[in-house]
Amino acid sequence: MKIIADTHAHTLASGHAYSTIKEMAAAAKAKGLKALALTEHAPEMPGTCGLFYFQNLDVVPREADGVRLLMGAEVNIMDPDGMIDLPEKTCMDLDIVVASIHPPCYGLDHTPEENIRAYVEVMKKPYVNIIGHPDDGRFPFDYEILVKTAKETGTLLEINNSSMRPQSSRKGTRENILTMLDLCRQYEV
């Protein structure tokens, strides 16, 4: 498989990454990527971009170092009803929207039923393109429902390499990723 795009990347603007857009575009080019999605964390994540950042992305060039730049956001799923932390209009103006559960924004005390409801509700939003790192065992849920809903809504499910790092705070990721991939194969997702 030849990877041609990175659809979930953070710059210095997200507060926990270390590269500029220019540096990331150069690295993407060196890896042979054709496109790079800049998906900074949305406002409820501590230390990241405010709303104005996302509303002002039209001033950023759409190409750097021969790599197409997609303007996006990694929105935070805030509750079991699928509420996110960017307005619909802002999301509709972006090229790509990744929706993820992060502990600072979504409590660890939700039930598996609430967790899958959060994912299902957010996948119903027409501007959500990808579910980010749905592999964290701290937020258990039914992967079969996730995969079936992704197929119904045309939402991509991310395999996030950061989840597999030994120092990752996410739990049970390898097993969860394998379960998700098996179900994707079974349901032809």
Q: Can you name each region flagged by the protein language model?
A:
Residues 4-14, 38-41, 131-134:
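Histidine-centered catalytic micro-motifs
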Residues 1-31:
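N-terminal active-site segment of His-dependent metallophosphoesterases
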Residues 2, 29, 42, 47-159, ...:
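Extended substrate/RNA-proximal surfaces in nucleic-acid metabolism proteins
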Residues 188-189:
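Short acidic/histidine-rich active-site segments
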Residues 20-24, 118, 179:
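Well-ordered alpha-helical segments embedded in enzymatic catalytic cores
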Residues 25, 29-32, 123-124, 185:
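Non-catalytic positions within long, well-ordered alpha-helices that form the structural scaffold/packing
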Residues 15-18, 48-51, 140-149, 167-183:
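Histidine/acidic-residue-rich catalytic or RNA/ligand-binding cores of hydrolases
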Residues 24, 39, 57, 146, ...:
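Aromatic/hydrophobic pocket-lining residues that form π-stacking "cages" and hydrophobic walls in ligand
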